Amino acid sequence: MAEPDFNEIMAQAQQMQEELQRVQGEIAQSEISGSAGNGLVKVTMKGTGEVTNVTIDKSVVDPDDVDTLQDLVLGALQDANTALQSYAQEKMGPFSQALG
Protein backbone atom coordinates (compact mmCIF):
# COMPACT_ATOMS: atom_id res chain seq x y z
CA MET A 1 0.00 0.00 0.00
CA ALA A 2 1.45 3.36 -1.03
CA GLU A 3 2.20 6.06 1.51
CA PRO A 4 0.04 9.18 1.13
CA ASP A 5 1.87 12.04 -0.58
CA PHE A 6 2.66 14.81 1.94
CA ASN A 7 1.94 17.53 -0.64
CA GLU A 8 -1.41 15.94 -1.42
CA ILE A 9 -2.31 15.85 2.28
CA MET A 10 -1.30 19.50 2.69
CA ALA A 11 -3.36 20.50 -0.38
CA GLN A 12 -6.40 18.70 1.04
CA ALA A 13 -5.91 20.39 4.41
CA GLN A 14 -5.64 23.80 2.72
CA GLN A 15 -8.79 23.13 0.70
CA MET A 16 -10.68 22.07 3.83
CA GLN A 17 -9.49 25.17 5.69
CA GLU A 18 -10.68 27.43 2.86
CA GLU A 19 -14.07 25.71 2.79
CA LEU A 20 -14.35 26.01 6.58
CA GLN A 21 -13.63 29.74 6.39
CA ARG A 22 -16.24 30.12 3.63
CA VAL A 23 -18.88 28.33 5.71
CA GLN A 24 -17.99 30.34 8.83
CA GLY A 25 -18.42 33.54 6.80
CA GLU A 26 -21.76 32.29 5.50
CA ILE A 27 -22.92 31.60 9.06
CA ALA A 28 -21.75 35.03 10.25
CA GLN A 29 -23.66 36.78 7.44
CA SER A 30 -26.87 34.82 7.99
CA GLU A 31 -29.91 36.24 9.75
CA ILE A 32 -31.86 34.00 12.08
CA SER A 33 -35.19 34.80 13.72
CA GLY A 34 -36.83 33.60 16.90
CA SER A 35 -40.17 34.33 18.49
CA ALA A 36 -42.23 33.87 21.62
CA GLY A 37 -45.88 34.18 22.54
CA ASN A 38 -47.08 32.85 19.18
CA GLY A 39 -45.13 35.56 17.37
CA LEU A 40 -46.04 38.46 19.64
CA VAL A 41 -42.33 39.10 20.23
CA LYS A 42 -39.82 38.48 17.45
CA VAL A 43 -36.04 38.76 17.49
CA THR A 44 -33.68 38.72 14.52
CA MET A 45 -29.96 38.15 14.97
CA LYS A 46 -26.94 37.71 12.76
CA GLY A 47 -24.92 34.53 12.78
CA THR A 48 -22.42 36.36 14.97
CA GLY A 49 -25.06 36.62 17.70
CA GLU A 50 -25.62 40.36 17.16
CA VAL A 51 -29.30 41.20 17.63
CA THR A 52 -30.44 43.32 14.68
CA ASN A 53 -34.17 43.68 15.29
CA VAL A 54 -36.77 43.25 18.01
CA THR A 55 -40.48 43.49 17.20
CA ILE A 56 -43.05 43.64 20.00
CA ASP A 57 -46.78 43.48 19.35
CA LYS A 58 -48.64 46.32 21.08
CA SER A 59 -50.96 43.86 22.79
CA VAL A 60 -48.19 42.66 25.13
CA VAL A 61 -47.12 46.15 26.22
CA ASP A 62 -48.77 46.55 29.62
CA PRO A 63 -47.12 48.86 32.17
CA ASP A 64 -48.77 46.82 34.93
CA ASP A 65 -47.30 43.54 33.66
CA VAL A 66 -43.70 44.16 32.67
CA ASP A 67 -42.69 40.67 33.80
CA THR A 68 -44.65 39.01 30.99
CA LEU A 69 -43.02 41.24 28.38
CA GLN A 70 -39.58 40.52 29.81
CA ASP A 71 -40.29 36.78 29.69
CA LEU A 72 -41.45 37.03 26.07
CA VAL A 73 -38.36 38.99 24.99
CA LEU A 74 -36.11 36.50 26.76
CA GLY A 75 -37.99 33.61 25.19
CA ALA A 76 -37.64 35.11 21.70
CA LEU A 77 -33.91 35.65 22.25
CA GLN A 78 -33.49 32.07 23.41
CA ASP A 79 -35.49 30.79 20.45
CA ALA A 80 -33.33 32.76 18.00
CA ASN A 81 -30.15 31.55 19.71
CA THR A 82 -31.31 27.92 19.53
CA ALA A 83 -32.15 28.36 15.84
CA LEU A 84 -28.71 29.88 15.23
CA GLN A 85 -26.96 26.99 16.97
CA SER A 86 -28.95 24.47 14.93
CA TYR A 87 -28.16 26.30 11.70
CA ALA A 88 -24.45 26.46 12.53
CA GLN A 89 -24.36 22.75 13.42
CA GLU A 90 -26.09 21.92 10.15
CA LYS A 91 -23.59 23.98 8.14
CA MET A 92 -20.57 22.70 10.08
CA GLY A 93 -21.71 19.06 10.12
CA PRO A 94 -19.55 17.91 7.20
CA PHE A 95 -16.45 19.27 8.94
CA SER A 96 -17.26 17.48 12.19
CA GLN A 97 -17.70 14.22 10.29
CA ALA A 98 -14.47 14.71 8.32
CA LEU A 99 -12.47 15.29 11.49
CA GLY A 100 -13.68 12.13 13.13
UniProtKB/Swiss-Prot annotation:
Quaternary assembly: Homodimer.
Q: What does this protein do?
A: Binds to DNA and alters its conformation. May be involved in regulation of gene expression, nucleoid organization and DNA protection.
**Organism (species):** Corynebacterium kroppenstedtii (strain DSM 44385 / JCM 11950 / CIP 105744 / CCUG 35717)
Superkingdom, according to UniProt?
A: Bacteria
Q: Does the keyword DNA-binding apply?
A: yes
Q: Does the keyword Transmembrane helix apply?
A: no
Keyword annotations for this protein, in alphabetical order, are: Cytoplasm, DNA-binding
Q: Family membership, please give it.
A: Belongs to the YbaB/EbfC family.
The cross-references to Pfam families, in alphabetical order and at most eight, read: YbaB_DNA_bd
| Protein name as it appears in the record | Nucleoid-associated protein ckrop_0143
Tell me which InterPro entries the record gives.
Answer: YbaB-like_sf, YbaB/EbfC
Q: Which HAMAP family match?
A: DNA_YbaB_EbfC
List where in the cell it is found: Cytoplasm, Nucleoid
Cellular-component GO terms for this entry: bacterial nucleoid; cytosol
Give any GO molecular function from the UniProt entry: DNA binding
